[in-house]
Amino acid sequence: MQKAGRLLGGWTQAWMSVRMASSGLTRRNPLSNKVALVTASTDGIGFAIARRLAEDGAHVVVSSRKQQNVDRAVATLQGEGLSVTGIVCHVGKAEDREKLITTALKRHQGIDILVSNAAVNPFFGNLMDVTEEVWDKVLSINVTATAMMIKAVVPEMEKRGGGSVVIVGSVAGFTRFPSLGPYNVSKTALLGLTKNFAAELAPKNIRVNCLAPGLIKTRFSSVLWEEKAREDFIKEAMQIRRLGKPEDCAGIVSFLCSEDASYINGETVVVGGGTPSRL
């Protein structure tokens, strides 16, 4: 009888802990003292991810191509009491990638997390009208720069005993967005990049996963939803009848970077409101 009572008491205590955690009565910092680099992180999805990682205890280095955007993002997040610094970084330039890493090392003596979010989409139209210049730009920034950024941070993660990389892809890698051919192709390539890096880096205790957002309401995606009729049509085609918010992506990334996801590697998590997501 006493044994049953102790068992029941243990279950009750565990259940109360779950209840308190889910209701926000307790909050741990799953990324406490981790150092995170987030590219293209002064607006939209990248900014929401940077904020969430910092809220969960990480020291975050944000970046953007424009100094004014970096200054604004850093001021906002530091104003919220978060550990955030920033630097200008054009991910397509090797010298800028090096400066981003150097900044993190000087301030925090290491790197544990990379979120590769930078992407471009300079074309809207028929695939047959895409120039070689456009193809080169899209693949260079969206795919090659992502690979080079990962290559650059891996030695620093090894020094820390491991790390976590999250590549921000898109549901467009699975299901084409009309008139965005080169962008769609680049995001499909990131699915393969994730799988290959995940397999190669796992022995180094570095996990690589991918986030595939659906249609998230940001400035970057505005061409797809700025007309109300188009937005309404998109909503009708979705299982969850709304467009996503940047914050819908942020918690998933924080989870993937945490020890709670220590046995997750090479996976793509779709945050798309039920958008079809299979190749």
Curated annotation (Swiss-Prot):
The protein's location, in the record's own words, is: Peroxisome
Q: Which GO terms describe its cellular component?
A: mitochondrion; peroxisome
Marked site: Important for the maintenance of the quaternary structure, the catalytic activity and cold stability? N196
User: Where in the sequence is Phosphoserine found?
Assistant: S221
What residues does the record give for site: Responsible for the stereoselective reduction of 3-ketosteroids into 3alpha-hydroxysteroids and benzil into S-benzoin?
Answer: F177, L180
Query: What EC number(s) does its UniProt record assign?
Result: 1.1.1.184, 1.1.1.300
Q: Which reaction does it catalyse?
A: a secondary alcohol + NADP(+) = a ketone + NADPH + H(+); 3alpha-hydroxy-5beta-pregnan-20-one + NADP(+) = 5beta-pregnan-3,20-dione + NADPH + H(+); 5beta-dihydrotestosterone + NADPH + H(+) = 5beta-androstane-3alpha,17beta-diol + NADP(+); all-trans-retinol + NADP(+) = all-trans-retinal + NADPH + H(+)
Positions modified as N6-succinyllysine?
Answer: K93, K217, K228, K235
Q: Which residues bind NADP(+)?
A: 37-61, 187
Q: Which GO terms describe its molecular function?
A: all-trans-retinol dehydrogenase (NADP+) activity; carbonyl reductase (NADPH) activity; identical protein binding; retinal dehydrogenase activity
- Which residues of this protein are catalytic? Y183 (proton acceptor)
Entries under InterPro entries matching the protein = NAD(P)-bd_dom_sf (IPR036291), Sc_DH/Rdtase_CS (IPR020904), SDR_fam (IPR002347)
Q: What is known of its domains?
A: The C-terminus peroxisomal targeting signal tripeptide is important for peroxisomal import. Once in the peroxisome, it is involved in intersubunit interactions. Three specific residues, Phe-177, Leu-180 and Asn-196 are conserved between non-primate mammals whereas the respective residues are serine, phenylalanine and threonine in primates. The two residues at positions 177 and 180 are molecular determinants responsible for the stereoselective reduction of 3-ketosteroids and benzil. The presence of an asparagine at position 196 is important for the maintenance of the quaternary structure resulting in stability at cold temperature and improved catalytic activity toward retinal.
Quaternary structure and partners: Homotetramer.
- Family to which the UniProt record says this protein belongs: Belongs to the short-chain dehydrogenases/reductases (SDR) family.
- What job does this protein perform? NADPH-dependent oxidoreductase which catalyzes the reduction of a variety of compounds bearing carbonyl groups including ketosteroids, alpha-dicarbonyl compounds, aldehydes, aromatic ketones and quinones. Reduces all-trans-retinal and 9-cis retinal. Reduces 3-ketosteroids and benzil into 3alpha-hydroxysteroids and S-benzoin, respectively, in contrast to the stereoselectivity of primates DHRS4s which produce 3beta-hydroxysteroids and R-benzoin. In the reverse reaction, catalyzes the NADP-dependent oxidation of 3alpha-hydroxysteroids and alcohol, but with much lower efficiency.
What more does the record tell us?
A: Primate DHRS4s display different stereoselectivity and catalytic efficiency in the oxidoreduction of some substrates as compared to other mammal DHRS4s due to a difference in conserved amino acid residues.
The molecule here is called: Dehydrogenase/reductase SDR family member 4
Native organism is Mus musculus
